[in-house]
Design a protein with these regions (language model features):
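Active-site helix/loop of acyl-thioester processing domains in fatty-acid/polyketide metabolism
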Residues: 47-67
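Catalytic core of tubulin tyrosine ligase-like
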Residues: 36
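Extracellular/lumenal ectodomain signal focusing on beta-strand-rich modules
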Residues: 74-76, 125
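HotDog/MaoC-like acyl-thioester-processing domains
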Residues: 2-11, 17-19, 23-29, 84-88, ...
Length: 151
């Protein structure tokens, strides 16, 4: 019997996704999930994943604005598969819209299963809208319409 924190990595439905892993892209964030991140079921708490999605979207949005950035919406969030303790989770970002004051970012979350396998599976996808704000917390125009590298 499988423990909730030790995934059955021999499942064929997970093995099929490794070919789709975005190898050509560099993740905004990579995190190993720890026991402190679990929910009552023993899998990773969705709020932990949402927090990292928010950070990844902010990193992408800062390519358009070096000042303050605030999250205004998480429009779409789809939890596709559970994340387990020990999974190496990668958060990939892609700008989908640049407005006058805001940037919309797609965040694709992948987990590399750590218990005896190199299986990679898509676990979550989200669309996040970030807005540039001034010292007073009000919207301000983005500094640029084209991204810059912030590595």
């Amino acid at each position: 019997m499988n423990s909730p924190i030790q995934p059955n990595t021999s499942r064929s439905d997970e093995e099929d996704f490794s070919a789709d892993y975005p190898r050509h892209k560099h993740p905004a964030i990579r995190v190993v999930m720890m026991p402190r991140d679990t929910n009552a079921l023993g899998t990773i708490f969705g709020g932990v994943i949402l927090s990292e999605i928010d950070l990844a979207a902010a990193i992408e949005a800062h390519r358009y604005h070096s000042g303050r950035i605030a999250t205004v919406a998480m429009d779409t969030i789809e939890f596709k598969r559970p994340v387990f303790v020990g999974d190496l989770v990668s958060f990939f970002t892609e700008t989908t819209r640049v407005g006058t004051t805001s940037v919309t970012v797609k965040v694709s979350v992948w987990a590399q299963r750590r218990f005896g396998s190199h299986v990679r599976v898509p676990v979550t996808e989200a669309s996040v809208t970030m807005v540039a704000v001034g010292e007073d917390g009000q919207k301000v125009p983005l500094e640029r319409r084209e991204p810059v590298d912030i590595d």
